[in-house]
Amino acid sequence: MTNIRKTHPLMKIINHSFIDLPAPSNISSWWNFGSLLGICLIIQILTGLFLAMHYTSDTMTAFSSVTHICRDVNYGWLIRYLHANGASMFFICLFLHVGRGLYYGSYLFLETWNIGVLLLFAVMATAFMGYVLPWGQMSFWGATVITNLLSAIPYIGSDLVQWIWGGFSVDKATLTRFFAFHFILPFIVAALAGVHLLFLHETGSNNPSGLSSDADKIPFHPYYTIKDILGVLFLFLILTSLVLFSPDLLGDPDNYTPANPLNTPPHIKPEWYFLFAYAILRSIPNKLGGVLALVMSILVLALIPLLHTSKQRSMMFRPFSQCLFWILVADLITLTWIGGQPVEHPFIIIGQLASILYFLLILVLMPITSVLENNLLKW
């Protein structure tokens, strides 16, 4: 009798995806982040579900319902901080996952990469709406500022903003719909992640060398299941350390003040994982230009496969491209720092230079360097 794992219609799918999947024998720990993102998503959905049982999406009671969760619900503080810091871990894994894709040329799997860009947008939208729900000062003003950006769209801008708000300002209608969308989007993200995996398994995984690994494959289980478990242990170690020792490290103190439309915080800023895009937005004096730059800062990822001019897939054997890649990483860290600073000298000019460098590196310098490396190798 054959194994049920290989014959049962449902088990067969799981078997081909996580057990008997042929995987390259040389993939490094940079390939752990896909599974870590899956774990993060499960943590977020489960903690979010329990939070939703106690949360009320009304402007009068939202803030106090979050306080009630932290004070009165059994382990409510743990669930709330796991959810808040779980989002930070999610984005750390996301950025590392995208960085890995850029470095090793994984973007040449076009369908997988484009679904990934779509996933990034969906997760960012989910996180933004989640930040509004506690209805603190930064929640309210963050929602007001970011949704207001849509008014820069010609002709339909102001109507669109009012339509999203459900009125003439961010109010009860806005909070209710944001809660509804924040609840449904993670399930859409989970479905998209399934499609992401489907497309990945059509081609098989890339590997650090960027060369075909068809001649040297090993089964996913037990080799990479054990390797992934190590990554999961590190994830849990960092997440639990954050939650139990410094749960508010990555949050904003202003969000412990209930939302007040009559009092603007001195410095409105989003969560840390949006700061790089926020810095790019602020570096352009024109409103519409800023919004376009903000969208392009993420959408530029979709153009990367078109800008691949190298005859090698991976950056493993391309030292000049490696230099530019790490300059890009440093530039993104600089942008993240600038996004959290007030709009004054010297931060304005640093932000503008870092924004120009960001687009220059991706759109111009990296493709030119790849051509140069091709010529150096006399190909």
UniProtKB/Swiss-Prot annotation:
Component of the ubiquinol-cytochrome c reductase complex (complex III or cytochrome b-c1 complex) that is part of the mitochondrial respiratory chain. The b-c1 complex mediates electron transfer from ubiquinol to cytochrome c. Contributes to the generation of a proton gradient across the mitochondrial membrane that is then used for ATP synthesis. It comes from Chodsigoa caovansunga. Heme 1 (or BL or b562) is low-potential and absorbs at about 562 nm, and heme 2 (or BH or b566) is high-potential and absorbs at about 566 nm. The chain crosses the membrane at residues 33-53, 77-98, 113-133, 178-198, 226-246, 288-308, 320-340, 347-367. One of its GO terms (biological process) is mitochondrial electron transport, ubiquinol to cytochrome c. This is Cytochrome b. It is a multi-pass membrane protein. It is found in: Mitochondrion inner membrane. Binds 2 heme b groups non-covalently. Its cofactor is heme b. A ubiquinone binds at H201. Heme b b562 binds at H83, H182. SUPFAM superfamilies: a domain/subunit of cytochrome bc1 complex (Ubiquinol-cytochrome c reductase), Transmembrane di-heme cytochromes. The cytochrome bc1 complex contains 11 subunits: 3 respiratory subunits (MT-CYB, CYC1 and UQCRFS1), 2 core proteins (UQCRC1 and UQCRC2) and 6 low-molecular weight proteins (UQCRH/QCR6, UQCRB/QCR7, UQCRQ/QCR8, UQCR10/QCR9, UQCR11/QCR10 and a cleavage product of UQCRFS1). This cytochrome bc1 complex then forms a dimer.
